[in-house]
């Protein structure tokens, strides 16, 4: 069985789940609306340009998780999934997932976005295997710290190698679908790298290396 790996944000989703969580928090005044929105947008631009300081970003993103009760977080997350995520699940993304399921492939999402947000999104997409950045939790509350290696850039390779070892799989016949040049380290590891609605940097690399370029939005 081959491994079909999917990035999440702007690949299977027509938007960025991490950024939209920030928008949700700001719109509902769970955080200071203007300052949080401005900082959230600045980090998103850093991500797009390949300049993101992942540790600074995670400190920013995890602060609301640490400051609020789990019950409040779960209530907000359920509302956010309805308002922000369900409308941006791409039908062609669902079709692609189903294609690989019918082939008998093992399905895996790997995302830099944290597991608090992405666990239910993976469930909505019907994918059981998820590698995401994990926020640390102690005694039922988030601490604001990251647990282990963030699954970002080369960190995706590190986390995937650990997952492969744990599950006794390998990358023979593997696919990886991504929109972002930030995922080049992992795209270079798989047998079939596929650029999905790629950013300019990834599109250029994909053309140079004769990788398949696919749109799930058209």
Kindly label every feature range from the protein language model.
Residues 16, 68, 155:
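Conserved active-site and cofactor/substrate-binding residues in soluble primary-metabolism enzymes
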Residues 8, 15, 53, 71-74:
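Catalytic cores of transferase enzymes with a strong primary signal for eukaryotic protein kinases
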